[in-house]
Design a protein with these regions (language model features):
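Residues forming the flavin
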Residues: 1-239
């Protein structure tokens, strides 16, 4: 099923390029990729560039246009730190589908339901398992490892510690090291519109916005699981 005939991708990481390239190779129009990062040297981005896919580096989507369906988006250039807009110049691009990629989040639901406590990892801005309620370990994506080489290395180390052994089958595996460029984390992207006059959605399916999360914090919620339930962010089929 083709989502749109004029597709645009908005991203802060490399994974959006996989979808853009896949559509392009099937003859489906990819108008552009809007990337909030200044650059990426990963192989998949270089492939997209070699195919002629237009990339707007250090830009953000500030508005969408259309009645009952998407017809255009407006983008503007970001400052170097990503906290403000670099200029008042606006670019309008025709499209009928906007795909978004904000990076991966560890699936920690079962861990927290078992009584486990989370910690926030600053370097990539994710919540990962911290205090375990029983004899268990978390490996792979649920522990915040998303590249295959990291998954194998960290899984091996975790199993060695947990089982008190010196070697695992993982040690004999040979994996090509990923050259994926890190995502850029900006919690609330700047806009040319007044804060409060727009709805900066965090969860499109549940209609949860950044304003809802701020309200939850103002009400005294601190645990991410409490904030989630108060705002419905990430609940239901999002899980």
């Amino acid at each position: 099923v083709i989502c749109g005939k004029k597709n645009i991708f908005f991203t802060n990481n490399d994974t959006a390029y996989e979808s853009a390239i896949s559509l392009f190779k099937k003859g489906i129009n990819v108008k552009a990729v809007i990337d909030i990062r200044e650059k990426s040297d990963s192989s998949i981005v270089k492939e997209a560039e070699s195919l002629g896919i237009k990339i707007y580096w250090s830009h953000t989507v500030v508005d969408t246009h259309g009645y009952k369906k998407l017809k255009q988006i407006s983008i503007m250039e970001l400052s170097k730190d990503g906290q403000s807009l670099a200029s008042s110049n606006k670019i309008i691009i025709n499209c009928d589908c906007l795909g978004m990629a904000g990076g991966w989040t560890p699936a920690v639901h079962l861990f927290t339901q078992s009584g486990g406590k989370l910690k926030f990892r600053e370097e990539d801005q994710v919540f990962i398992p911290n205090k375990y309620p029983s004899e268990q370990i978390s490996i792979g994506s649920c522990n915040g490892d998303f590249e295959l080489d990291k998954i194998i290395k960290n899984s091996s180390n975790s199993l060695k510690d947990f089982l008190e052994i010196n070697k695992t089958d993982f040690d004999d595996l040979s994996v090509v090291t990923s050259n994926e460029t890190s995502k850029k984390n900006i919690w609330l992207l700047p806009s040319n519109k007044v804060i409060g006059k727009t709805k900066p959605f965090v969860d499109y399916q549940n209609d949860a916005t950044a304003k809802d999360i701020k309200l939850a914090l103002r009400e005294g919620f601190r645990s991410i699981e409490h904030v989630k339930r108060y705002t419905t962010t990430g609940m239901g089929t999002d899980q």
